[in-house]
Amino acid sequence: MRWVLPDHIQDALPAEADKIERLRRRLLDAFRSHGYQLVVPPLLEYLDSLTTGAGQDLKLRTFKLVDQLSGRTMGVRADMTPQVARIDAHLLNRRGVSRLCYCGSVLHTLPSTLTATREPLQLGAELYGHAGLDADIEIIRLLAEVMRLAEVPASRIDLGHVGLFRVLAARAGMVPGREEELFDLLQAKDLPDLHALVAGVAEPVRSALLALPGLYGGAEVLDKARVCLPDDAEIREALDDLSRLAAALGDLPVSFDLADLRGYHYHSGVVFAAYGGGSPAALALGGRYDRVGEAFGRGRPATGFSLDLRELAVRLADVGQPGAILAPAGGDAALEALVAQLRSRGEVVMTELPGHDGSWNEAGCDRQLIRREGRWTVESLQGE
């Protein structure tokens, strides 16, 4: 069956494709109005460039192939964030703040969930060159605006900080392999296996690691964290950052999840996840990743977010736009002038082709151009 697509790969048919494109234009225009400049990275690069500074998860999600010109291993991008970091660090080479945005397909070897596509249409925004919380606040507010424009207002924005995990893992003496296991258990909030893994860790770090999965909810979480986490300068700084963010974003539905560590391999500070539209999974993910550019010769403070445009477009309401107008074929100058005028006003006008016996309603036409008393007029098109 030559028409069958691989699992978790889908076509976008006209109705869905129209939603995706309308939403893409709307969101990129919003980025532009905030000063974010569009970049278009290539679909594939040398593998070491695509996965530099990333964790094992990104490497496993990346399709690999051999470049027939150089013989080097290439990868099809699974995430555009490292590509944009490369552009900022190596190509633009700006000294001040740089605001960049992007939209393009990425490809995953495996779906992230049972129902997820393996070809998300990734859209995102990144802010480089400012280490202060003002940059994080700008990015989170931009994300909230994007979700509002997509007609899926954020019902919850969870904030976390990977610095908490890094400090506790270091103080627990976790080697890289065990740290990965600890990360997985915290993400899954698997308390029985977490108890077993940290059984030999000294106090107070052991109790702190066991407390992390329960540190989620409202502002009271930060007060609780100050009590049950060690009195460490880096931990205090991370909690202070989260407190200041919560105060600055008081008009948004902000909550906290201190065990949410997605992307911790390259994130370096505040992380966040946005939920909405009744989805149990996060619709957008983001955070600070100050060290990613180091692999490209220029480490810069950076923060940003990304989302799957397809996932948002599914939730976009039908706008009830008028259908197309059917125009008869022919060389009538008045007709051609009217067709051009209608198209300039945003109307869709299809020209009838000789011998076509299909349904014009099926093709999207609900009106037609009819000549009445020497003048062309737009009238309702009756179904065939």
Curated annotation (Swiss-Prot):
Signal sequence, start to end: none
Lineage top rank: taxon: Bacteria
Record-linked InterPro entries: aa-tRNA-synth_II/BPL/LPL, HisRS-like_core, HisZ
Pathway: Amino-acid biosynthesis; L-histidine biosynthesis; L-histidine from 5-phospho-alpha-D-ribose 1-diphosphate: step 1/9
Keyword line: Amino-acid biosynthesis, Cytoplasm, Histidine biosynthesis
Gene Ontology BP terms: L-histidine biosynthetic process
Keyword Repeat carried by entry: no
Gene Ontology cellular-component terms listed: cytoplasm
Subcellular location: Cytoplasm
Leftover remarks: This function is generally fulfilled by the C-terminal part of HisG, which is missing in some bacteria such as this one.
Subunit annotation: Heteromultimer composed of HisG and HisZ subunits.
NCBIfam families cross-referenced by the UniProt entry: hisZ_biosyn_reg, PRK12292.1-1, PRK12421.1
Family in the record: Belongs to the class-II aminoacyl-tRNA synthetase family. HisZ subfamily.
Protein role: Required for the first step of histidine biosynthesis. May allow the feedback regulation of ATP phosphoribosyltransferase activity by histidine.
Protein name: ATP phosphoribosyltransferase regulatory subunit
Species the sequence originates in: Aromatoleum aromaticum (strain DSM 19018 / LMG 30748 / EbN1)
Gene (name only): hisZ
